[in-house]
Amino acid sequence: MLPCTIVRKPLLLFVLAIAVRAVLFLHFPDPAYPDSYYYVDVAQSLAAGHGFNIDFIWIFVEVGGKIPANPVLPIPADAHWMPLASIVQVPFIWLLGPTTLASSLPFILLGALSAPMAWGLARDAGASERVALGAGLLTAIPVLATPFMAQPDNFGLYQPLVVGALWAGGRGLKGHGRSFALAGALVALATLARSDGILVGVTLGLLFVADRGRAWRSGGVRRPAIPLWAGIACAGLFLLVAGPWFARQLTVFGSLSPSSSTGKVLLIRTFSEWNSITIPATVDHFLGQGLGPLIASRVGGLVAAVTIYAVLVGGVVLVPFMLIGGWLRRRSLDFSPAFLYAGILFAFNALFFAVHVPGGTFIHSAIGLAPHSYVLVMEGIAASVGWVAARRRGWDVEQATRVFSGAAVAFAVVAGAAASLTTHATWASRVADHQFAAAALDAAGAPFTDRVMSIDASGTRYWSGRGGVVLVNDPLPTVEQVARAYEIRWLILERSDAVPAVAPILDGGARPAWIGPPIASRPAAPSSTGVELPPGSVDVAVYPVCVAPDDTRCSGALAGAATGSLP
């Protein structure tokens, strides 16, 4: 009976998690934002036999943070993002073709593993069956983070790798050397999914050192829990799995972390500088903001990280129980890796990635902590009920615990469904803009070799099939330099996501001579803030770009034929 239970419950959790992610996919099957577009674009290039090469620049850190001396397309892929989210799609694309199902299916299947893993780590840590089951259910439907779990992005991929590595690390502290060794391979895969996966490796390294330090201080009374061979095997497996990719980075880019070497990742004052090629990314520029703004930005990054985690993973309501459970488990070997990783992750993002935290950098990594957090939530609920019941004679501890545990899961279901509906609606609006622009280019007879400038170059590539470059957050003369360097033929502007330099154009104002009349535009909807927009304002428009001497599309003679709108 026991073996059947051990297999049945995690299997049911796995099936439930797949079902949740399948519903998400059916409701919104497409990639939704630059990260997921990028991973799909690279995957399709790999599947087509073109290797790690792409014909667009989604951000200029991919080519050194400026217009290179030899501005060419295609370029080597993954100078900033890591390759695993693209690699896992390739077999499915070969099998099913370049479809949305082929790109999302690996993330649905792999991400669903986190639910039974939450159950397993809870039981391995000595938690009750109710706690383990509740944690598995919450991981299957992770509150306000639910909408992201079927995207061809790292949410579904990174989470089980981090959970597995931290779980294996905890087992290592209890004397399971093989588990600790296996963690090295999981850390390598996590790092190939996200570069800050290396922080999980730092966590395990610190645990290994601390374990041997305690043994040394005991004067030989206590032996290390983690055998030396396990530590060596852990490091060896990491190098074996991740080493080839880092060798590729050194060969292609001359750096283990090409984007970081530009300074644009760490040495920017505000997130708006991330997409600029004129603002310097130097130590002098970074420190020149002054001590006050520097400290304020770091504190702001920490506050943003805590808020994002509390809202998306905890739905705010579950956070108090998460903290109670954390306090009860503060000395638990099973949770030591998760607690240490959480501290490192929050500190690292606050100190080094502060301005990137609100843009999604943090939650992509922090999602790996969700299953451990949900175990703590369920234990916190049980402890809270027990505390109240001890002071209220009329309470039935068993029944009350069951009711409040069920309420937590019900809250996650309702919150996850509501978040998915609203988030998908926002994504659908952006997709409509992409589709509008792609249809305009097709209607104009633009060859697929034409290059396009847009704020989301990876999304433009996905929807229109045309490569190009990102619209940089710089003055129009700099934008023109980029257009000339890369022989851009078209410009897509979207009011929902634009840089300040093009605001007058979206408002129907004057255009520079190298930007022609729009071939298609959609009139601006009334402002939600009540601010009246100027006559002629548009929400999305496609303009010809004339940087070649013989290009006459931007002349006044073509204005009558070039203006208009698509249905």
Each PLM stretch: what is its role?
Residues 4, 212-216, 296-346, 380-383:
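Hydrophobic, aromatic-rich transmembrane alpha-helices
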Residues 399-459, 472, 476, 480-485, ...:
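Membrane-embedded, lumen/periplasm-facing catalytic core of multi-pass transferases
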Residues 4, 123-126, 165-182, 210-218:
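Membrane-interface transmembrane helices that cradle and orient dolichyl/undecaprenyl
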Residues 10-11, 105-126, 164:
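Transmembrane-helix motifs of polytopic, lipid-linked glycan transferases
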Residues 115, 155-158, 190-193, 199-202, ...:
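Hydrophobic/aromatic-rich transmembrane helices and adjacent perimembrane loops
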Residues 34-37, 102-112, 134-164, 169, ...:
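Multi-pass, polyprenyl lipid-linked donor-dependent membrane glycosyltransferases
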Residues 11-15, 130-133, 185, 202-208, ...:
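Signature aromatic-anchored transmembrane alpha helix within multi-pass, membrane-resident enzymes
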Residues 12-19, 139, 185-187, 316-321, ...:
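Transmembrane alpha-helix segments characteristic
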